[in-house]
Amino acid sequence: MNIYYEQDADLAVLQNKNIAILGYGSQGHAHALNLKDSGMNVCVGLKTDSASCAKAREAGLKVDTVAEAVKWADIVMILLPDQTQKSVYDNEIAPNLKSGATLAFGHGFNIHYKQIVPPADVNVIMIAPKSPGHLVRRTYTEGNGVPCLIAVHQDATGDAKAIALAWAKGIGGTKAGVIETSFKDETETDLFGEQAVLCGGSAELIKAGFETLTEAGYPAELAYFECMHELKLIVDLYYEGGLSRMNYSVSDTAEYGGMTRGPRVVTSAAKAEMKKILEEIQDGRFAKEFIDECNSGYKKMNELRESNRNHPIEVVGAKLRGMMSWLKKK
């Protein structure tokens, strides 16, 4: 796997190019401001009624409609929600995209699953920082950066990779390291991590643990602390130094109990189900299901959201978080 640093990227590749960033959310604001501060000519493309227009202008950025920004741009970065990208592309990007332009993405979903099929005469690249946008921005202002992924799906002009590397450098990524991958690998591993571990697996583990304790008669408050609240303490240790750091930092009782009982929770049956989830991602079944869900008005998703909001752990959690001064907004 190739990893690139400062000396491997040249910001001059982006100079004298017009850069449009579509979207001004978590990632959009970070990319726009970092590239602007790196000396690039940046315009943010937004709907005319977007609340983000004022924010972007206040930050000193040029703002225009999506269509006009794309007409003007040599490089167009799409940092919009996955489910809205196809419609915006079909209606506002494709009719205005220059031949020889570069189309960039922060995630590979729409390219990999062929929701967006760009013409052969444009570059298609990805630059994906592996952190939230606020951290991309903060580390840049501190003179550092966060690790990034880059990928080239289509190289029409012969310099698509150089553009991706220059972009990564412009947002600070080459100071940490830039890993080369593919749209396929980024998309499939990202979706799997979200579904099986980060957003799906962990949430179900928390709820199951909470329910096991409360059904056995223990107070909901204690169940919340042990199964939800303290998870951050453990995840922070993983984040800082991996599994070994966590095992070193907890008590011997916790370490032994975790190593001997954990495999009884995440069993071979759970891993077999993970493999099925991965297969659904690889063969496109999940993508089709999600796209159909979006097109049908989010009926199932809204029902699941409501179910989660009404779970007892949310009720007791809201009460206990009210006791935590460090969580209260100043």
Curated annotation (Swiss-Prot):
Gene3D superfamilies: 6.10.240.10, NAD(P)-binding Rossmann-like Domain. Mg(2+) 2 binds at D190, E226, E230. Keywords: Amino-acid biosynthesis, Branched-chain amino acid biosynthesis, Magnesium, Metal-binding, NADP, Oxidoreductase. Binds 2 magnesium ions per subunit. The active site is at H107. One of its GO terms (biological process) is isoleucine biosynthetic process. Residues 182-327 form the KARI C-terminal knotted domain. Mg(2+) 1 binds at D190, E194. This is Ketol-acid reductoisomerase (NADP(+)). It comes from Chlorobaculum tepidum (strain ATCC 49652 / DSM 12025 / NBRC 103806 / TLS). The gene is ilvC.
